[in-house]
Design a protein with these regions (language model features):
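A glycine-rich phosphate-binding loop feature that marks nucleotide/adenosyl-phosphate handling sites
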Residues: 69-74, 107-118, 172-176, 210-214
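Short Ser/Thr-interspersed hydrophobic loop/turn segments at strand-loop and sheet-helix junctions
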Residues: 2-20, 48-62, 193-195, 303, ...
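Extended amphipathic alpha-helical segments enriched in small hydrophobics
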Residues: 74-156, 353, 357-364, 389
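Beta-sheet entry/capping signal
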Residues: 7-10, 34-36, 47, 77, ...
Length: 440
């Protein structure tokens, strides 16, 4: 316990790859899965970090830990010699580069803003910003290669192992995040949704709102925390495969792009986003407008990416009517309160039922006056809408039941516990909680 919250080095004890030590600043604790070591002489920490990430360390560990169980015993028995070269600044630079790289991810505690959004002041075309980011990323990767090879050579020379070891580092072994057009756009979209929810803001860097029950959110709005790009009023964002609501996610993504990159290149930027998403996330459709492609990604793939990013502990929860996707929406768990479901019902589900019914009635009239292929097409459209209507009506019955219960959540219980409180209103309940949802 006397070492808790002290500066040290940590590593993953069970791994199929080589040992990789990481620097831990003051303020953190550790456990058996992520053990830590502490230098007797604090000034040696950078030399030890360089040594335990060099090629030399693996020679010793092949004999001390042949099963690749890097527990404290084998690691503690590795002999250490301080290098004759001064590598302190080299190792500090490597730590800074890797930390800055990690902090570009939303899941980092020190995440500030999205890379492409940050570049928007200088590049009004997202494609130009991405090209700059890609070139800078390559420079950093080659800088890391240079630094790691210097570190390797320092210890190879020290142990006189030049005949059996090369200091060369393969680019594939450098663990920095690579610039990738599709991934960078996916991250930008995720950040934009964070801004819609109020988790992030274009006016403030870092995490802006992550309290409980929407408490204090109105005060943030009053302070002007979301002045440039207003956050959603209730933290409920419709995620629809068609445009049924003015404030659905797709419409707000377009608004976000306009706000950040401006009006002049809006269409070109939307097309770049759509093109990027079609590189891997979704298949391209010939002649499909850019905004429709973005909508298709959001309605079919965003949730999967979000689940992957947050390792099945999502912060935006997907409420779904079911298989036909008659209604789906995202709710930010930190803004959820016991009135959220009632609002979801009155503001979205009930009005959508009325719209579905009106469209079914309209299609019935058109079917009566049509013939041949046109009649067949209209009937197919009507039948599809009828299925959605029936699914949504069933969802509304269940939603009303849970809304009347005025369910509260406690963030201290974690996502796994809280996500299971809403029966089958939510998507992928079993994947998140481990149990099948309660069906009423």
């Amino acid at each position: 316990i006397q070492f808790y919250c002290k500066e040290g080095l940590t590593w993953t004890s069970l791994t199929i790859s080589s040992l990789s030590m990481r620097y831990v600043p003051n303020g953190y604790i550790f456990d058996a899965k992520g053990p830590m070591c502490f230098p007797i002489n604090a000034a040696d920490i950078w030399d030890i970090l360089g040594y335990t990430n060099s090629k030399i360390i693996n020679i010793f560990l092949k004999h001390l830990a042949p099963t690749m169980d890097y527990s404290q015993g084998p690691v503690g028995n590795v002999p250490f010699k301080s290098p004759t070269r001064n590598i302190t600044n080299i190792i500090k630079e490597l730590v800074t580069i890797h930390k800055n790289d990690w902090d570009t991810n939303e899941i980092s505690f020190e995440f500030q803003t999205n890379i492409l959004v940050k570049l928007a002041n200088d590049y009004k075309k997202i494609s130009d910003g991405y090209t700059f980011r890609e070139n800078e990323n390559k420079k950093i990767i080659y800088r890391v290669k240079e630094l790691e090879e210097y570190n390797n050579s320092s210890f190879i020379d020290l142990f006189e192992l030049n005949d059996i070891l090369s200091p060369e580092v393969n680019l594939s072994d450098i663990t920095l995040d690579r610039a990738a057009q599709e991934n960078d756009i996916i991250k930008m979209i995720s950040y934009s949704i964070g801004c819609m929810m109020g988790r992030y803001s274009l006016d403030r860097e870092g995490l802006v709102y992550a309290h409980e029950g929407n408490k204090g959110f109105a005060e943030l709005v009053a302070e002007g925390a979301y002045k440039t790009f207003p956050a959603d009023n209730d933290g409920i964002l419709p995620l629809m495969d068609e445009e049924w609501f003015d404030d659905d996610v797709t419409s707000r993504v377009k608004e976000f792009v306009r706000t950040v990159w401006g009006e002049e290149h809006l269409q070109e930027n939307l097309e770049f986003i759509a093109e990027s998403l079609c590189l891997y996330a979704i298949s391209p459709k010939k002649g499909e407008p850019a905004l429709d492609t973005i909508r298709r990604y959001l309605s079919t793939q965003f949730w999967k990416e979000h689940m992957k990013m947050y390792k099945k502990r999502p912060i935006y929860w997907l409420f779904s009517s079911g298989k036909t996707k008659a209604f789906e929406c995202l709710v930010y768990l930190h803004r959820y309160n016991d009135a959220t479901l009632a609002r979801m019902r009155t503001e979205y589900v009930v009005p959508l039922l009325a719209r579905y019914q009106a469209n079914i009635d309209r299609l019935n009239e058109l079917v009566d006056g049509a013939s041949g292929g046109e009649a067949t097409r209209l009937k197919r459209e009507r039948d599809s809408l009828s299925k959605k209507f029936n699914e949504l009506r069933s969802f509304d019955d269940r939603l009303r039941h849970y809304a009347d219960m005025r369910i509260s959540i406690d963030l201290d219980d974690g996502v796994k516990v809280n996500y299971g409180k809403f029966g089958d209103l939510l998507a992928d309940v079993k994947a998140i909680t481990g149990n099948a949802p309660e069906v009423i």
